[in-house]
A protein has these predicted regions:
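Acidic (Asp/Glu)-rich catalytic clusters
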Residues: 85-94, 112-123, 156-166
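Short, well-ordered coil/turn segments that N-cap beta-strands
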Residues: 28-31, 65-67, 93-99, 121-123, ...
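Active-site-adjacent beta->alpha loops and helix N-cap segments on the catalytic face
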Residues: 25-27, 51, 75-88, 108-111, ...
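Hydrophobic or amphipathic alpha-helical targeting/insertion segments
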Residues: 107-133, 145
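N-terminal small/glycine-rich loop or linker at the start of catalytic domains
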Residues: 22-47, 126-140, 166-172
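Helix-rich catalytic cores of soluble enzyme domains
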Residues: 133-180
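Catalytic domains of carbohydrate-active enzymes, especially glycoside hydrolases
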Residues: 53-74
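Glycine-rich, proline-tolerant flexible connector loops at the mouths of alpha/beta enzymes
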Residues: 67-93, 97, 101-102, 127-139, ...
Length: 180
């Protein structure tokens, strides 16, 4: 039984947790759904969608009533960059729809992401970084405060680029593969 420690708690809860919603009978308002069907990323099909197919899918998602649509990872994919530029340059994004773009917390990727959304009226910039114990130890060779610093710096960069952006920017952050 020498390996029992590997099952130790590897997560933490926020200091002040409010879970009043658990006691409610029903939701007060409908949730906001964000479609992520257009991002190929590392979940790509063997033959990923081309710009024309993405346009067709985007128009279908609009028809279905989605108000938030993740259009991809434009800093990492030229197809997704070109697709987003096409939507903006051809005024295909309705005024009540937010396009969402995904990027890692790295300055060159955040800069390229903001380049991709120039001319967009409103966008959600979704940043992320790896936070799992295994990845921070084995891949990044960093301790927890350094990983937190990556997220903080990414947030500061989005804030910096958003200050010069003529449209509305919403920041979204996610830990990637959170396990500790």
């Amino acid at each position: 039984m020498k390996n029992y420690r590997k099952y130790a708690k590897q997560y933490f809860l926020p200091k002040e947790v409010c879970r009043d919603w658990v006691a409610r009978d029903a939701l007060d308002e409908a949730p906001v759904w964000c479609s992520v069907d257009l991002r190929d990323g590392n979940q790509a099909l063997v033959d990923p969608m081309v710009v024309e197919e993405k346009i067709e899918m985007f128009q279908y998602l609009i028809k279905l009533g989605f108000k938030e649509i993740e259009v991809g990872f434009p800093a990492a994919s030229q197809i997704e960059f070109d697709f987003l530029r096409h939507l903006i340059e051809h005024d295909m994004i309705p005024d009540d729809v937010y396009v969402q773009v995904l990027t890692q917390c790295r300055e060159e990727l955040i800069a390229r992401t903001f380049e991709s959304i120039q001319g967009c009226k409103q966008a959600i910039v979704h940043i992320y970084n790896s936070t799992s114990t295994l990845q921070r130890d084995v891949v990044f060779h960093m301790d927890r405060p350094h990983i937190v610093d990556i997220a903080v710096k990414g947030t500061e960069l989005v804030k910096k680029y958003a200050a010069d952006f003529p449209g509305k920017i919403v920041l979204e952050y996610s830990p990637e593969s959170f396990t500790g």
